[in-house]
Structure formats: structure tokens, C-alpha cells
Amino acid sequence: MINAVIAIELEAYLEHDGQIEVVHDQGLPVDGYTLYLRYENERGDALAQWLCDHPDHSWLTQFGILLATSYHIPLHDYTPHTLAA
């Protein structure tokens, strides 16, 4: 039997010289956020992934700022494959 979970992943990003980079370190500037819904097995392997996109990105940026500041979310990768390392 495969145990599966639905994960919600919020990534902060920075635009630099026309390139988009994911922000992993606290204290770096952030230009916006992306929100992913991911269907994973128990090992953390993505079985399916959806990027939540909307023409008006301001709501997602405001949501990301709200989560990051309200819950003091550190900008680190806590996915199962990095926790095992």
C-alpha cells in the first residue's frame, strides 16, 4: 500500500538580471512567491505537481508575506530528502 500526501509548498523568489532564483536564505530580498500543490508518496517523491498561477500575482505575494511573517517560516528546504541528509 502506498501512503501519499498532498503538500503545499510556498517558495520565495528573486528576479536578478532577467533570471528567477529561488530564495533559500533568510534576510535576502524577495520579489514574490510561488505556490505549489504536490501529491507525494511516503518517500517525498512527487507523483504530481501543480503550480498555482493567476494573472494577478499580488494576492499570492500578499499571502506569502502573511505566512512568512505570521508564522516566522524560515526559508530553508525541509523536504524529506534534505532532512535525511
Task: Give the label of every model feature segment.
Residues 84-85:
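Intrinsically disordered, low-complexity segments enriched in small/polar and acidic residues
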Residues 64:
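Generic structural marker for isolated residues within well-ordered, non-membrane alpha-helices
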Residues 1-43, 70, 76-81:
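Short N-terminal "domain-start" leader segments
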